[in-house]
């Protein structure tokens, strides 16, 4: 039996994630009271051919605080030995949530006559802290389109069954904020910057000119060697601990040159030992026309 618990802040994409999982053959139950988890786990565990069943359960902040604080123990104490459970938490920045609710004009579940949108968002974050702490996977959807969210959930949650631990190398620009879903963050702003070469400024770390420039820098080789050695040393420990994913974020100033180049180079090296290695370039995806 495979059980996924999908939670997160309202507006972060929980419903969209459940719709995708339903398309992938999961039986989905949304807004389940946490205190009913043990009974549900027992019931689906006793069903015929239970080992082949796949369930996804949506849990939100409308549960009692005391119930949410017990979510980790409720799962651990009631899950059958032959079952697998993964808790996925979707997070989004306050600014993006305010924008999303303003644009859609949807009512926040915790807002009322006495609670405005800003206060409801802050209140929900506190209520869901026990779930966020218990999460096996945290996905920051602040900068994701619906298509990107579905692709990410499919890659990390649906696709990880047969491919083992997924290793994601994510490039980003520090000027746009640090990704909250990273397990490790490496700052490469100290490296020579192609941005200061006028002929390279408009290119990205995927293009030949930038690659040639960075390939010629000894500091870049040293940084690559050190990050690669770190990931290669510790990735087996994460995998042995039944982790389904490992996200390594590489950041430069604008997220266009150095971080992109290193993320691609690191992914190419790690693919020699791992079947499920991907890259994501946050700032490239946000360029006009991307």
Curated annotation (Swiss-Prot):
Q: Where does ATP bind?
A: 8-15
Q: Give the transmembrane region(s).
A: none
Question: A Gene Ontology MF term for this entry?
Answer: ATP binding
Q: Check the record and name the InterPro entries matching this protein.
A: P-loop_NTPase, RapZ-like, RapZ-like_N, RapZ_C
Q: Which domain of life is it from?
A: Bacteria
Amino acids binding GTP: 60-63
> Which is a Pfam family this sequence falls into?
RapZ-like_N
Keyword annotations: ATP-binding, GTP-binding, Nucleotide-binding
Q: What's its job?
A: Displays ATPase and GTPase activities.
What family does the Swiss-Prot or TrEMBL record give for this protein?
Belongs to the RapZ-like family.
NCBIfam families, alphabetized: PRK05416.1
Full protein name:
Nucleotide-binding protein Sde_3181
What lineage, starting at the top, does this entry show? Bacteria, Pseudomonadati, Pseudomonadota, Gammaproteobacteria, Cellvibrionales
């Amino acid at each position: 039996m495979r059980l996924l618990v999908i939670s997160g802040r309202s507006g972060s994409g929980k419903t969209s994630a459940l719709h995708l999982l339903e398309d992938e053959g999961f039986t989905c139950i949304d807004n389940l009271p946490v205190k009913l988890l043990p009974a549900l786990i027992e019931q689906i565990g006793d069903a015929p051919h239970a080992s082949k069943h796949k369930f996804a359960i949506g849990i939100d902040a409308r549960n009692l605080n005391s119930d949410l604080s017990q979510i980790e123990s409720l799962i651990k104490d009631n899950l059958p030995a032959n079952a697998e459970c993964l808790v996925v938490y979707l997070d989004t920045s306050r600014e993006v949530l305010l924008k999303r609710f303003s644009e859609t004009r949807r009512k926040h579940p915790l807002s009322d006559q006495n609670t405005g949108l800003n206060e409801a968002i802050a209140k929900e974050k506190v209520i869901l802290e026990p779930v966020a702490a218990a999460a096996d996977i945290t996905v920051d959807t602040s900068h994701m389109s619906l298509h990107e969210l579905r692709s990410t959930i499919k890659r990390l949650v649906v696709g990880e069954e047969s491919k083992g631990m997924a290793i994601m190398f994510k490039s980003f620009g520090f000027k746009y904020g640090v990704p909250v879903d990273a397990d490790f963050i490496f700052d490469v702003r100290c490296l020579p910057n192609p941005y200061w070469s006028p002929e390279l400024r408009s290119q990205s770390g995927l293009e030949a000119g930038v690659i040639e420039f960075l390939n010629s820098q000894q500091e870049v080789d040293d940084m690559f060697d050190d990050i690669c050695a770190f990931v290669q040393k510790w990735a087996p420990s994460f995998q042995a601990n039944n982790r389904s994913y490992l996200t390594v974020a590489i950041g430069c100033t604008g997220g266009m040159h150095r971080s992109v180049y290193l993320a691609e180079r690191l992914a190419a090296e790690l693919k020699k030992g791992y079947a499920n290695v991907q890259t994501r370039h946050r700032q490239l995806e946000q360029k006009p026309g991307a």
